[in-house]
């Protein structure tokens, strides 16, 4: 199994030129040969086909591949001024041109919708994307999102599997996010077994799980790397054994925010805002995410799965 790394965390490094060659080059220096490519609205302007061709060339030059991508997050049921269908059609075409075989497209939600309404609307939404997926032959991945306190109902493996089964199309499969699942107190092994042959991709990251709501922050989608704290509670033995038992074919893809911008309030001293330590340096970022690669290699090696 190959290790992969989502490319979006470099967006948080100040004054770093965010072109594909720079961003993917840094990820490659950390050891990764695969990336989960983050498609933004800026990618999907009138030049999106040229951008996709450039990405494909950069990946080839670096000896990398992008087995999966993430489309812009737009709520199809409350899109504002955005043409969500145009965004998703372009995202699928972008992937085809760039050589990316599958892309995460999030479900939508409306405040106070019931589970029945949520499923009815989202099954119809995903089915409306079938022609756009079939034309380039790119898979759409449904990701687990939400918790008991919000309007999403893709909390558990059974929920996401039900959604994929209701859409009922071979190009519509599942990306399991370990951190999101951990916030909902999921048995990870049982979850992976439930997802079974529909599980085609991962977002691997950690957090401290669920606390009772009396805590100020009882769920925090932290996106930390494994072993970052003694309280991190994703069980990677359960994850990897589940992947083995279902014959998982995808990458072990990290979606971590390790050594990134702090969201703490600004510090003011003598009337001036001080930001000297708000961001890490690029060198610190590289060292930290080289460690992420090494951790992933250690995990996969322990099960005889690592593929360089």
Regions found by a protein language model. Give the residues of each.
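Active-site acidic/histidine proton-transfer and metal-coordination neighborhood
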Residues: 58-61, 77-174, 265-266, 279, ...
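Conserved beta-strand positions in the central sheet of alpha/beta enzyme cores
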Residues: 36, 68, 104, 141, ...
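Glycine-rich, proline-tolerant flexible connector loops at the mouths of alpha/beta enzymes
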Residues: 36-59, 109-113
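Active-site mouth loops of central-metabolism enzymes
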Residues: 2-19, 74-85, 112-118
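Residue-level detector of anion-binding/catalytic polar loops
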Residues: 33-34, 65, 101, 139, ...
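The substrate-binding groove and active-site-proximal loops of carbohydrate-active enzymes
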Residues: 73-81, 116, 179, 223-230
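Histidine-acidic metal/acid-base catalytic patches
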Residues: 1-9, 17-31, 99, 157-176, ...
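Active-site-proximal loop/turn and secondary-structure-junction residues that shape catalytic pockets
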Residues: 9-11, 39-41, 72-75, 107-111, ...
């Amino acid at each position: 199994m190959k290790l992969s790394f989502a490319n979006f965390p470099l967006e948080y490094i100040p004054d770093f030129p965010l072109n594909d060659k720079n961003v993917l080059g840094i990820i490659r220096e950390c050891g990764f040969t695969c990336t989960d490519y983050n498609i933004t609205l800026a990618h999907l302007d009138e030049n999106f086909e040229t951008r996709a061709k450039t990405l494909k060339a950069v990946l080839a030059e670096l000896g990398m591949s992008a087995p999966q991508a993430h489309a812009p997050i737009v709520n199809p049921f409350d899109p504002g001024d955005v043409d969500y269908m145009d965004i998703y059609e372009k995202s699928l075409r972008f992937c085809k041109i760039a050589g990316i075989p599958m892309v995460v497209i999030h479900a939508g939600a409306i405040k106070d919708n019931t589970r029945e309404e949520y499923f009815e609307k989202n099954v119809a939404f995903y089915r409306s994307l079938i022609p756009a997926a079939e034309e380039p032959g790119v898979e759409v991945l449904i990701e687990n999102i939400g918790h008991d306190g919000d309007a999403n109902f893709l909390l558990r493996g059974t929920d996401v599997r039900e959604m994929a089964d209701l859409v009922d199309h071979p190009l519509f499969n599942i990306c399991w996010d370990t951190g999101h699942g951990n916030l909902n107190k999921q048995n990870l092994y049982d979850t992976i077994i439930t997802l079974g042959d529909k599980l085609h991709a991962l977002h691997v990251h950690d957090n401290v799980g669920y606390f009772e709501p009396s805590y100020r922050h009882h769920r925090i989608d932290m996106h930390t790397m494994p072993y970052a704290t003694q309280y991190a509670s994703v069980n990677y033995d359960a994850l990897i054994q589940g992947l083995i038992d279902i014959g998982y074919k995808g990458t072990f893809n990290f979606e971590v925010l390790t050594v990134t911008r702090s969201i703490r309030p600004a510090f003011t001293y003598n009337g001036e805002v001080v930001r000297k330590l708000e961001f890490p340096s690029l060198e610190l970022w590289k060292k930290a995410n080289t460690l992420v690669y090494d951790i992933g290699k250690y995990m996969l090696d322990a099960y005889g799965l690592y593929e360089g």
